[in-house]
């Protein structure tokens, strides 16, 4: 409807402009004729007729202009009503949009407040957990100092041999007089629990090789089946300017194992000819060798206990904790002071024996050793 009204208005305006132009032309002609003396003209009747025609034309133009003006007013009135409807519709749409926007803002504000409250609650929980951990750490540190006179950090520093990594070296004398087929051994080195390790050298026969061995002391080996996987580095040191200097290194992946109580494995390093080693690495027949042992995995071997909680501790204990059929003799008062869980457990029961589920005996042994001030926290355990 808007397009039809616009087109009609345009047509009327164009016709009006055309009539206006014609009227201006006629007025111009009449202006020129007005300067001529009518008395000098012949044919007064003709002139009169022209004047009458012009007058009629003027009247027609006036009527036409009046009609066009009325139609234009009608169109304007119709357009005004249409524009009012559009304006009202626009106002209604704007109002609805504002209401929708307010509803969305209110909903988002509610969600934001809920999220902020949840974050605040989580932050408070985190602060509580952090404060609890700090409190427990201080308590354990205090207990460690009370029992051992050392802080936990000092115990970790002093506990370089954590059972999973150890180093040892040995200096062999009179290597130049070593006979073929004879094996010369070092002192024992304890590592990986209660196992004893040693190194040895042997001049092979009939070849001219000098071999270096890393081995386990068979006299103290467990008789059950077990396996040790390790990364081992052997270093030959050279005597240089009155000191031994690391000169030649070799690394090997090794597996030591015992099957049915029989141990036969040992690691062998072949560094070359006997005479070449004497020339390069010995000083007056003295030869220094180092081993760096990193235990990767053990199966069938238990960690060396730093404190006993067996029957020998029963006299100074008033409770027995049973973990996987293994009994640990402990003090109720001591454990209750370290843990609210133990405190609640002992408070709600008059029993002297308690069974703990969901934990293995080795982990509980380590836990008790830590509480009793033993250096159970090693560098590797802290990293894990």
Curated annotation (Swiss-Prot):
Which residues does the UniProt record annotate as the domain BTB? 317-380
Report the Pfam families cross-referenced here.
Answer: BTB (PF00651)
Q: Which InterPro entries match?
A: BTB-MATH_domain_protein, BTB/POZ_dom, MATH/TRAF_dom, SKP1/BTB/POZ_sf
Q: Which UniProt keywords apply?
A: Coiled coil
Work out whether the entry's keyword set contains ATP-binding. no
Ranges for domain MATH: 167-277
UniProt keyword Coiled coil, yes or no: yes
Q: Which CDD domains match?
A: BTB_POZ_ZBTB_KLHL-like
Name residues in a coiled coil. Answer: 41-127
Q: What is this protein called?
A: BTB and MATH domain-containing protein 34
